[in-house]
Amino acid sequence: MSLWLPSEATVYLPPVPVSKVVSTDEYVARTNIYYHAGTSRLLAVGHPYFPIKKPNNNKILVPKVSGLQYRVFRIHLPDPNKFGFPDTSFYNPDTQRLVWACVGVEVGRGQPLGVGISGHPLLNKLDDTENASAYAANAGVDNRECISMDYKQTQLCLIGCKPPIGEHWGKGSPCTNVAVNPGDCPPLELINTVIQDGDMVDTGFGAMDFTTLQANKSEVPLDICTSICKYPDYIKMVSEPYGDSLFFYLRREQMFVRHLFNRAGAVGENVPDDLYIKGSGSTANLASSNYFPTPSGSMVTSDAQIFNKPYWLQRAQGHNNGICWGNQLFVTVVDTTRSTNMSLCAAISTSETTYKNTNFKEYLRHGEEYDLQFIFQLCKITLTADVMTYIHSMNSTILEDWNFGLQPPPGGTLEDTYRFVTSQAIACQKHTPPAPKEDPLKKYTFWEVNLKEKFSADLDQFPLGRKFLLQAGLKAKPKFTLGKRKATPTTSSTSTTAKRKKRKL
């Protein structure tokens, strides 16, 4: 009797087909129309360590402006579909829509190079572990000292049409079956958040939430002890399917360790006994094994600058090749090489003839200067059924902004019109206006820059435009033509002049 037995070999089924993400070059046609747009001089001045607040209502009198902050510029562009072009024959508004493509950018930075320092008047520093003078095994009640330092050196320029994504270590939630006692080490969790204007960069102490992970507020300098230091999540932004958050980025980081210290306080996790041989006398008790360094960014030089230079976008790292969806662009800038903190002094009394410290008040300020220049290329999209379906799956608000949909039927019904519209005998005739479109990014803080009225087709009138024409091999259109100069009329003379005879050589 023959029986059918199932095969024991493993059978692999093909995966379920998914929609493929394509490059914007597949459905975006570029034109030969270019525009220049630039900001005015952008300035920011404030206190480098903390905001100055009014004692009564905590109103910020002086904002916090530090060279260790992210500057996230949200660039608002005009709608090209409502743009006034001298010649509109290059596209069909019934079947096509226009978009901007960023092809050139230059981030200008003013102010001289300089190194800004920070510190803490009560930093948790126990001993100098690099050059220890004595074995400090028993710490006192309060060993905090006044320590200052410079930070890690960072230069960053990141461009996309969506806000940049950052990462940092925060306090996680323990499992419900784990008992948590006061003083236990909190669990860590990698958190992704949007990088906003004014967020602190990694200064050399790690990308972490110092507010929740350092309870004594004395582990790091003043400007970050109650802040979150974020680091751009390049891995997440590069792996984004549509590539909107990161067209390209420029990055330069450097750091070395200047001093080596250890922390005061009870050691939460003791050194295992098998890692050392117990001592006697002053070494009977182990010193604190919680070591930490003070970072330093070393020398700043103009030879290693990534700013004040033009950059041309030929091919983006993702599928979005520079298309500015939603008519907006995000430029994220970090430059710690111009982080000088200016010291200001104001005299309380000018009648004293002998110097006294109490006669003067000292202040700190930090100033920043930016200038953003762009070259945008006009592009058109033919709205076929496949393209519209793809764009709707990518971002449904794009088609809504284009006002692309079914037209309402003509109004053929009879309408009622009352004479006394304010009478209480009839229903209210006041129509409620439609609610304005809500900004999906209104809960975030950005440096808003409006370029809707700063587009110009005269590229040769701007420094970045002339650089673009030179590298692209294009010529600016002449404004006027020079004709041949006419000969000046001469008065006729009655006397005849003898013609010069030709002579053979």
From Swiss-Prot:
GO cellular component terms, A-Z: host cell nucleus; T=7 icosahedral viral capsid
Keyword tags: Capsid protein, Disulfide bond, Host nucleus, Host-virus interaction, Late protein, T=7 icosahedral capsid protein, Ubl conjugation, Viral attachment to host cell, Viral penetration into host cytoplasm, Virion, Virus endocytosis by host, Virus entry into host cell
Biased amino acid composition, Low complexity: 488-497
Protein modification: ISGylated by host HERC5, this results in dominant-negative effect on virus infectivity.
The keyword Ubl conjugation is annotated on this UniProt entry: yes
InterPro entries: Capsid_L1_Papillomavir (IPR002210), Capsid_L1_sf_Papillomavir (IPR036973), dsDNA_vir_gr_I_capsid (IPR011222)
Subcellular location: Virion; Host nucleus
HAMAP family: PPV_L1
Other notes: HPV16, in comparison to HPV types 6 and 11, is more often associated with malignant genital cancers in humans.
Function field: Forms an icosahedral capsid with a T=7 symmetry and a 50 nm diameter. The capsid is composed of 72 pentamers linked to each other by disulfide bonds and associated with L2 proteins. Binds to heparan sulfate proteoglycans on cell surface of basal layer keratinocytes to provide initial virion attachment. This binding mediates a conformational change in the virus capsid that facilitates efficient infection. The virion enters the host cell via endocytosis. During virus trafficking, L1 protein dissociates from the viral DNA and the genomic DNA is released to the host nucleus.
Quaternary organization: Self-assembles into homopentamers. The capsid has an icosahedral symmetry and consists of 72 capsomers, with each capsomer being a pentamer of L1. Interacts with the minor capsid protein L2; this interaction is necessary for viral genome encapsidation. Interacts with protein E2; this interaction enhances E2-dependent replication and transcription activation. Interacts with host KPNA2; this interaction mediates the nuclear localization of L1 capsomers. Interacts with host ITGA6. Interacts with host SDC1; this interaction promotes efficient infection of keratinocytes.
UniProt name for this protein: Major capsid protein L1
Taxonomic lineage from the root: Viruses, Monodnaviria, Shotokuvirae, Cossaviricota, Papovaviricetes
